[in-house]
Amino acid sequence: MICLLFWNCNKKKENKEVNILYIISEKDKKFLTHLQKQNIPPPLPEFYFHNQIIIDKNGDFYFYQKEAIPWHCIESETDTIPDFINLKPIEIIKIPNNSCVDFIKLNISNKAERQRQIIIASEKDTINNMNFNKILTFLNNSLSSKIDAFKIRRTTQEEDTVLKYKKNNEYYFSDSIKWDKTKIKFYK
């Protein structure tokens, strides 16, 4: 009995990590309100950087890169519809959930300056994921992460669709998809 008491006294305190909810729509609203109070116009919508990390509904992480993201003149501040980027299932890879920070260090942090930008896109508005919190902590320390810019947003219709085909291992042909033209822009 005495041994048990001493054993409990010597037990080291466990380092429990706190999981913080991240709600994309709330963060966006707070940011825009802050800009409005400062009389600063909102930034132009950016949907894609060179690197994209997707968090699916199950909390799993996926990654894809695009060399040439289409760039065109934004018609107005309310132009919030992403471009069709011709994403294919083969371009998306799964990242082990507990290795996301290491993945960023090995594959993004050491790239040329314009390639050290990341979009984190979530299928859900609320992100409740310990690994996401680790990524956010890492990215917020620009000296150690060497990431120039990052943005968190909801997934696009194209990302949702292509990821579904990837996960179900189904044949994908973008022309056969009935795209909602109010959610995606096609340029000819």
Predicted segment positions?
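Long, low-hydrophobicity, acidic/polar, solvent-exposed interaction domains
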Residues: 11-188
